[in-house]
UniProtKB/Swiss-Prot annotation:
Localization of this protein: Cytoplasm
GO biological process terms on file: beta-alanine biosynthetic process; pantothenate biosynthetic process; polyamine catabolic process
Active site feature: 268, 302
Alphabetized SUPFAM superfamilies for the sequence: ALDH-like
Site residues by UniProt (Transition state stabilizer): 169
Annotated protein name in UniProt: Aldehyde dehydrogenase [NAD(P)+] 1
Species of the source: Saccharomyces cerevisiae (strain ATCC 204508 / S288c) (Baker's yeast)
Any single Pfam family the record assigns to this protein: Aldedh
Molecular-function GO term, any one: aldehyde dehydrogenase (NAD+) activity
Domain of life: Eukaryota
Length: 506
């Protein structure tokens, strides 16, 4: 019999836990049908943590059947009020286990515990509280008078069985963005965590069961995207799929969904988000926000302000201060334990990502011969894991691959603009449209930018401080649909129209 649990010790926090390693189907942990496993690695050390069961197409079928049976027989008949109660139960359990969940995110994803992972759990608590209160409020239809003898009304009904695929940069937070909204709307779920970062969601499954959710309502199938993700996207008995990840893979999900049963699709994909700094901006505050917006989470953020455009009159001053802030506040050298409060910039997720980001840095330095500043020498001496120092390229032309491609690491490009029209043209010159930021004291200019930028989120005099009550999603190749806020429930509901004829003659 395969091992379905292992003991994990985190001595820095004096935390011991029993870590599930199996697939979670029908409220039970079980082995994969072929017994294959995936090894997960601590990105701060490059050393293995453990191995967990890897799902395949047969396991996906099993999970879908469990979700369908749960929806048809139990969950579709459960009141919205009761769904909210289950989510409230879950909220209490997350509060009790938040330190353990944050510790698993640090261990498995390399997130600095004090500055990142605990913040993720704070957001998870906020959004679970929000969706618990939303379950019996956002599923209401409307009455529409038509004529003297006719009216119509609408019903908001769940899709049924929903598949969700979540990324490795915010493993548990992104899972909860999707999972809690789908459950509040009345769907059953099969969710696939990233193969790099499955531990926290598998542990979270124990809380799902303790909260009282009926068997089959939530099913977790860790595994490789090319196998499990493909099986979910192409499955004929899944009614909707929600994906967060790269634009390339999002295209595969959309294609597979269209070629199977035309299931509804929500995509949150890549970004190359611009931050614009006008000459009237509070420069120190703008720099603090922009530094956090690119270096937080080691730049592994789809909304990271990885392109910075600065008005030419203040460009040199901005660059000088930006480098000083990066060195003073975000340097990684000698701070290689993500459980230590001194560690602010953790490792990137894997050797593959490390090599990919390194190749962009080398291209900028050697092939494009760009001006470059790094907070530490690179590779970093003494680092065992996948640590990359914050890296700033300046005077970067619009044609540069570093400016056009999503690098997904602590690498930022800085360029200058002359006036508003120039800034807007540069900011919109991308295939992406996830987020943007503008720094100015001119209220008119700020609102003009919010109107004119082609992006799903606009921050004015801040960056990357989203709120769970506000819709989130992208324009252009950054995605389809919205999550969070009321949209976080609406995206998992369909509208049905009912026509009532009161005339006795017709």
């Amino acid at each position: 019999m395969p091992t379905l649990y292992t003991d994990i010790e985190i001595p820095q926090l004096k935390i011991s836990l029993k870590q599930p390693l199996g697939l979670f189907i029908n409220n039970e942990f079980c082995p994969s049908s072929d017994g294959k496993t995936i090894e997960t690695v601590n990105p701060a050390t490059g050393e293995p943590i453990t191995s967990f069961q890897a799902a395949n197409e047969k396991d996906v079928d099993k999970a879908v059947k469990a979700a369908r049976a749960a929806f048809d027989n139990v969950w579709s008949k459960t009141s919205s009020e009761q769904r909210g109660i289950y989510l409230s139960n879950l909220l209490k359990l997350i509060e009790e286990e938040q330190d353990t969940l944050a510790a698993l995110e640090t261990l498995d994803a390399g997130k600095p515990y004090h500055s990142n992972a605990k913040g993720d759990l704070a957001q998870i608590l906020q959004l679970t509280r929000y969706f618990a209160g939303s379950a019996d409020k956002f599923d209401k239809g409307a009455t529409i008078p038509l004529t003297f003898n006719k009216f119509a009304y609408t019903l908001k009904v769940p899709f049924g069985v929903v598949a969700q695929i979540v990324p490795w940069n915010y493993p548990l937070a992104m899972a909860c963005w999707k999972l809690q909204g789908a459950l509040a709307a009345g769907n059953t779920v099969i969710i696939k965590p990233a193969e790099n970062t499955s531990l926290s969601l598998l542990y979270f499954a124990t809380l799902i069961k303790k909260a009282g959710f009926p068997p089959g309502v939530v099913n977790i199938v860790p595994g490789y995207g090319s196998l499990v993700g493909q099986a979910l996207a192409s499955h004929m008995d899944i009614d909707k799929i929600s994906f967060t990840g790269s634009t390339k893979v999002g295209g595969f999900v959309l294609e597979a969904s269209g070629q199977s049963n035309l299931k509804d699709v929500t995509l949150e994909c890549g970004g190359k988000s611009p931050a614009l700094v006008f000459e009237d901006a509070d420069l120190d505050k703008a720099i603090d926000w922009i530094a956090a917006g690119i270096f937080y989470n080691s730049g592994q953020n789809c909304t990271a302000n990885s392109r910075v455009y600065v008005q030419s009159s203040i460009y040199d001053k901005f660059v000088e201060k930006f480098k000083e802030t990066a060195k003073k506040e975000w340097d990684v050298a000698g701070k290689f334990d993500p459980f230590d409060e001194k560690c602010i910039v953790g490792p990137v997720i894997s050797s593959t990502q490390y090599d990919r980001i390194k190749s962009y840095i080398e291209r900028g330095k050697r092939e494009e011969k760009l001006d470059m500043f790094q907070t530490s020498e690179f590779p970093i001496g003494g680092a065992k894991g996948y640590f990359i120092p914050p890296t700033i390229f300046t005077d970067v032309p619009q044609t540069s691959k570093l400016l056009q491609d999503e690098i997904f690491g602590p690498v930022v490009v800085v360029s200058k603009f002359t006036n508003y029209d120039d800034a807007l043209k540069l900011a919109n010159d991308t295939c992406y449209g996830l987020a943007s930021a503008v720094f100015t004291k001119d209220v008119k200019k700020a609102h003009m930018f919010a109107r004119d930028i082609k992006a799903g989120t606009v921050w004015i005099n801040s960056s990357n401080d989203e709120d769970v009550t506000v819709p989130f999603g992208g324009f252009k190749m950054s995605g389809i649909g919205r999550e969070l806020g009321q949209s976080g429930v609406d995206t998992y509901l369909q509208t049905k129209a009912v026509h009532i004829n009161l005339s006795l003659d017709n």
